[in-house]
Amino acid sequence: MGADAGRPQKALADGNELPPRLKAGTGAKAVQAGFGPHGVAVTGTILAYTDTVLASGREHLTDWQVEVNHAIKETGPSLNTDAVLAVPTKTSEVRLFELDNGTMSRARLAKEVSDYERCAGHRVWEGAHGTNGRTLPFWQRHRYTRSERFPRLHVVLVDTEKHLLDNRRQALTADVYGIAIAVWVNNLRRL
């Protein structure tokens, strides 16, 4: 860490590995804070995704991280992604995963998804002062530099009763209808 501690995280462009985290919301402290079931669900989601979706052999998991901060300095949105899986494709190098154990309100879950849209829309200026420059999406310039599109967001609803999952999925789908990023809403069994 040392010399890199004050610098922003490196982009994935350096060899299909996610940048190291400066802080992590996992481990013994997270379990003591009551986040143990959430951590187990995140791990279960990563395993389910690799066992089902990646089993076809068309895509390959090269790395993953949990609790990845996607803060954009003081001016932009700040959110922590439950899991980021490095699954390089032609248009994107990662998949983003948000899990809901059924504990978030419908409004809060919809706001989290909307925060991803804000993050995708945040732009930065590139060019010398006094020249004709251009703006680029922050995520494309500084984080996922080999991606043509903002990474797909998977919202995974952790298993409870089937009718409750279906109701929650339908409600979230209605709440985020028309959003400008790709959002897949599913439960762990249907992943």
Roles of regions detected by a PLM:
Residues 16-191:
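Electrostatic, structured charged patches in enzyme active sites and in nucleic-acid/phosphate-binding
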